[in-house]
Amino acid sequence: MAKDVKFGIDARKQMMDGVNVLANAVKVTLGPKGRNVVIDKSFGAPAITKDGVSVAKEIELENKFENMGAQLVREVASKTNDVAGDGTTTATVLAQAILVEGMKSVAAGMNPMDLKRGIDKAVAAAVEEIHNISTPADDSKAIAQVGSISANSDTKIGELIAEAMDKVGKKGVITVEEGSGFEDSLEVVEGMQFDRGYISPYFANKQDSLTAEFENPYILLVDKKISNIREIVPLLEQVMQQSKPLLIIAEDVENEALATLVVNNMRGGLKTCAVKAPGFGDRRKAMLQDIAILTGGTVISEEVGMSLETATIEQLGTAKKVTVGKENTVIVDGAGNKADIEARVESINRQIEESTSDYDKEKLQERVAKLSGGVAVIKVGAATETAMKEKKDRVDDALHATRAAVEEGVVPGGGVALVRALNALADLKGDNEDQNAGINILRRAMEAPLRQIVTNAGDEASVVVNEVKNGSGNYGYNAATGVYGDMLEMGILDPAKVSRSALEHAASVAGLMLTTEAMITDKPQSDDPMAGMGGAGMGGMGGMGGMM
């Protein structure tokens, strides 16, 4: 296929046109008074969003050179979203600002490589300064404030996230789901829950809720099918002497073994309940091992030379309470050793870091949550499906932002942190004049998020930026109310990780684009439907002429 190649100024101009189209669509969403963007969908109602990355993902341009520019800036938003979960619009605004200033310098004859070196030098100094001005986000109030800001000033969402973190821990698993009502709500599942219920409804001992509930039961874990009752009779007799109920978690319990356990249950003998083990294949073995560590038991596995006939009561796990329903099982307060549980969690966390599959990561995180003792579910409520999707996006953003805040602390929000980080660039010098120009490019670009927030609020950007620069510390501008003051006291916080990631990714991609000298794309195919038919048609005519 033939290629279309553009060089130098022509290539950079078309690339910059694409950058501007995408960035101009994304940046209107920035800040508390950011505007909405309406996105047409091929099916259903149009989507309305204030989420920068959602807008960026929708943009595809007809001109291939312009589209390359747009897609490179989209990469800035996506990378920032992947690392910090928020800050996509800030990253896009920064990338555009660096490119606009940088392209002017390149057009004026400066060395693009030196400009990039100057920008990189300035970014390193600014990131260090962001780290220095950050404060830890330890308390619920700070977490709620970060969540509220990221959810476009929705305080209810911030409070729900803070409450969820209180209940399941800052590293606990919090998921976001679409609710059925108009109100947002929080549900917390304590203990380890997995999606397998009783094998037979005859195991249920609470007829009103159709659940089997046991206090201080023994828990037998087996990684094979149990079909012969004689295999487990010795163990059942030992448990019966202790007068405690027994929960059996196995690959399956069937035939004679299941029938005997059910009949025994109904006659009021040994209280038992059989449940299929969660997961499949290797994941099932791993989850059985998780349950064993949580309950202080041992998985009876023939692979390591164990057998059910010789199993003893010491190999059984125990828990304070077990509730088994039709579709799930909850084990609360397992008797496992705390150090063993922490070591297991640490081991799974290492697997998460090494994994390249999003699906595997999600499943591993679920296992961490179950071992850590709880999962919080935020159920989002709204009046319409369109509003529900928009709100769910905002809650997801807020959740990621609060996690980022817990990791690296918080900085004053509203673009103030980047303005304060300019202090680190005041005396910074490059190796030559072109590098100094690169440092100056970043100086101007770091004001861009604050300028855009103010512009979206309908105020005069230059006036506000000068006022904020003349202040110090957390002094900034609350665009929602039009008031100057201490951003931390006003509850306007950004996670330091978000500001850092936005700056690093924007500068990285912008630097690569500034040093671009050629662009290659496929030549457009001819769309004339008759183009390939002329010769064939004429040949046919010739044939007919010969016949006459």
Curated annotation (Swiss-Prot):
Question: What keywords are annotated for this sequence in UniProt?
Answer: ATP-binding, Chaperone, Cytoplasm, Isomerase, Nucleotide-binding
Q: Tell me, which GO biological process terms does this entry list?
A: protein refolding
The EC number(s) attached to this protein equal 5.6.1.7
Reactions accelerated catalytically: ATP + H2O + a folded polypeptide = ADP + phosphate + an unfolded polypeptide
One annotated GO molecular function is: isomerase activity
Q: Sorted alphabetically, which InterPro entries does this protein's record hold? A: Chaperonin_Cpn60_CS, Cpn60/GroEL, Cpn60/GroEL/TCP-1, GroEL-like_apical_dom_sf, GROEL-like_equatorial_sf, TCP-1-like_intermed_sf
Give the residues annotated as coiled coil: none
Give one Pfam hit by family name. Answer: Cpn60_TCP1
Note whether Transcription regulation occurs among the keywords: no
According to its UniProt record, where is this protein located? Cytoplasm
CDD domains per the UniProt record, alphabetical: GroEL
State where ATP binds: 29-32, 50, 86-90, 414, 478-480, 494
State the superkingdom.
Bacteria
Show the PANTHER family listed in the entry.
60 KDA HEAT SHOCK PROTEIN, MITOCHONDRIAL
Q: Which HAMAP family match?
A: CH60 (MF_00600)
Protein task: Together with its co-chaperonin GroES, plays an essential role in assisting protein folding. The GroEL-GroES system forms a nano-cage that allows encapsulation of the non-native substrate proteins and provides a physical environment optimized to promote and accelerate protein folding.
The similarity annotation says: Belongs to the chaperonin (HSP60) family.
Q: Which NCBIfam families match?
A: GroEL (TIGR02348), PRK00013.1 (NF000592), PRK12849.1 (NF009487), PRK12850.1 (NF009488), PRK12851.1 (NF009489)
Please give the subunit comment from the record.
Forms a cylinder of 14 subunits composed of two heptameric rings stacked back-to-back. Interacts with the co-chaperonin GroES.
Q: What is this protein called?
A: Chaperonin GroEL
Task: Please give the organism.
Answer: Psychrobacter sp. (strain PRwf-1)
